[in-house]
């Protein structure tokens, strides 16, 4: 029996994150200051049911685990008001000169109609001497944000942590990974 040759790809760093709104006219928010991304599978766990006669196993019924999507955590190094608004569900106001003028969160006690978006995460492929030889793009569709947690401490920079939920439609893949030679411009 021949051994199967496997491809090994050394990956490092969060090179870039894009949040692309799923609207008639999509908006792309590029986050180049994100320093940590975590993707955790959201799973419907299967079950096992046994048919036993005392110490003898007669039969089993099994259902497999099913992936329903991913829960993503994005840590950013700076505050980006439009990204904060997209994730939290409120409205960010920017003046004519691009200056941040304010943010209003969603109304307390009411259902928030958050805009769905696709998340593209780019990470670097490295070689033996540390050079970047390419990128991998991880894509999760139909994401929605959750209410933001805010923690501000003396002596530390504010670093927002966003929690996102990706829930693909029936028949869609929960994740796609695409190799790229370079980052998009």
Roles of regions detected by a PLM:
Residues 2-89, 142-156:
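Solvent-exposed edge beta-strands and adjacent loop segments
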Residues 113-137, 169:
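Extended, acidic-biased charged interface segments
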Residues 80-83, 127-129, 148, 170-173:
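Residue-level signal for secondary-structure boundary sites
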Residues 76-78, 123, 164-168:
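Short, structured patches in soluble enzyme cores that scaffold and shape functional sites
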Residues 63-65, 106-111, 127-131, 149-158:
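Exposed beta-sheet edge/beta-hairpin loop segments within beta-rich domains
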Residues 28-30, 112, 172:
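Basic/polar low-complexity intrinsically disordered segments
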Residues 65-120:
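Extracellular-facing segments of soluble proteins and assemblies that are Gly/Ser/Thr-biased and enriched
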Residues 135-185:
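Mixed-charge, glycine-accented linear interaction segment located at domain edges/termini
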């Amino acid at each position: 029996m021949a051994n199967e040759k496997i491809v090994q790809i050394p990956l490092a760093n969060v090179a870039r994150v894009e949040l692309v709104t799923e609207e008639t006219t999509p908006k792309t928010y590029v986050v180049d200051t994100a320093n940590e991304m975590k993707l955790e599978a959201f799973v419907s766990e299967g079950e096992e049911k046994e048919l036993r006669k005392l110490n003898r196993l007669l039969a089993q019924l099994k259902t497999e685990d099913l992936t329903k999507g991913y829960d993503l955590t994005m840590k950013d190094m700076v505050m980006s008001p439009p990204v904060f608004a997209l994730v939290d569900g409120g409205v960010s106001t920017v003046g004519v000169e691009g200056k941040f003028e304010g943010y209003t969160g969603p109304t307390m006690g009411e259902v928030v109609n958050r805009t769905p978006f696709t998340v593209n995460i780019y990470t670097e492929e490295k070689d033996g001497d540390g050079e970047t030889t390419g990128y991998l793009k991880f894509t999760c569709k139909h994401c929605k944000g959750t209410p933001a947690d805010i923690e501000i401490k003396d002596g530390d920079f504010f670093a927002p942590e966003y929690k996102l939920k990706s829930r693909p439609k029936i028949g869609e893949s929960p994740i796609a990974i695409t190799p790229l030679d370079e980052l998009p411009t």
